[in-house]
Amino acid sequence: MNDMERHRLDRVAEGMRPSARFTGRWLGVGLAGWLVVAALAAWDRVGQMARADDYDLAIASLQQTEESNASNQRAVEAARQLQGARPAVLLRVLEGMKRATPVGRNYLSGVAGTLFQRDSIYLRSQLESFLLDTTQDGEARYLVFEWLTEGQEALRDQMLDGFRDDPSLELRYAAIGRAIDRLDKNPELAVLRKLLDQSRHPSQIETLAKKLKESGETVDQAKVFGFLMTWDVIGPFDNHEQKHFHTVYPVERDLLDKPFDPSQKYSGKSGEVGWQSITTEEATGIVDLAESFNKEKGAIVYARTVFRCEQPQEVEVRLGCINANKLWVNGQEVFTHEVYHAGMSIDQYIGSVKMKAGDNEIVLKICQNEQTESWAQRWQFQLRISDATGKAVLAQNR
């Protein structure tokens, strides 16, 4: 036990016997004195209840923090208030991460770290229970895992073995990463297949797919991810000076309001345009519109496909796109991003959708600007369907 831990235990022990210092003082006071003691105790309980309410309000304030100066100022004050809380509040702060905004989550994790450094010795068993509670926030559980296993590699390895199928993406990533690091030079195919099935992070999926291929195994990487490979596309339509991101062209109105007609023609940027079907062969699922539309600039293309479900289900639509984009599913807007050439990555934009049984129509509007720099020539997207953990959900009509 180090000096800090001993000091904390001393503080706990001191806090458990506060009346020892005052026993003699009250011995001869009589009934009136005991009434005063009772009143003070009652006031203390009321004070604790008031502080508990204040802490809950502070946590709620942090949960709602947005990226604005006023919101951040309120968050700083709430965080300062929580940093003086009693040990048990740490668990409530961790629980609060589940319903927090991304900014609020950062504040809450910072407060939790401060409280842990101060009070962890009192709460280890409760933190262990929190870690194993899969209904809690995945990032919060990973924080607790890091705290509890710091400097204890054997314990870390032992615990990670149980997290390869965990709903916490952070814990799962750490567990799969450790398993990959410990693979033999010639790992068994069954082991690689199992790890690939358990993996959710794109980099780990790519690593395991490569190892399987090196071992002679055929891997459909696009299928593992759940990329949609075949699309009906039409364009180009005008986007001169980026003015038409919000323009509802007749094709857009028809896509959202009418059954799809592949023979329909429309007036495009430079004349009449019609639908064409394209299928990407890329393992990354990238659909290259620049190639299909002769590197047109200041232009818009619409893409649509059908995702068939056996039964209704909640899914996530995950788009990677370096251009401005809008996405609809069954005529309902899922998200919109008017951003050009700010980077592209798998799962860049994620929207939750309730798919119906049968055919579900997915529509994209992909807008290219008129920049001439070499890095601004890409006009492409990749889209996949997954569950909430990132595991591919495959269409019946794939």
Model-derived segments and their meaning:
Residues 197-286, 365-398:
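Accessory carbohydrate-binding/adhesion or oligomerization-edge regions at the termini
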Residues 73-85, 95, 106-118, 129, ...:
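Structural detector for internal amphipathic alpha-helices that build alpha-solenoid repeat scaffolds
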Residues 329-379:
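Beta-strand-rich ligand-recognition modules
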Residues 309, 314-328, 362:
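Aromatic-lined ligand-binding clefts that engage carbohydrates, nucleic acids, or primary amines
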Residues 1-25:
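N-terminal secretory signal peptides that target proteins for export/translocation
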Residues 70-71, 100-101, 136-137, 167-168, ...:
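Short inter-helical turns and helix N-cap capping residues of alpha-solenoid HEAT/ARM repeat scaffolds
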Residues 290-295, 304-307, 350-354:
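Beta-strand-rich interaction surfaces with strong enrichment in secreted/lumenal proteins
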Residues 49, 53-65, 86-97, 120-132, ...:
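Amphipathic alpha-helical scaffolding segments comprising HEAT/armadillo-like alpha-solenoid repeats
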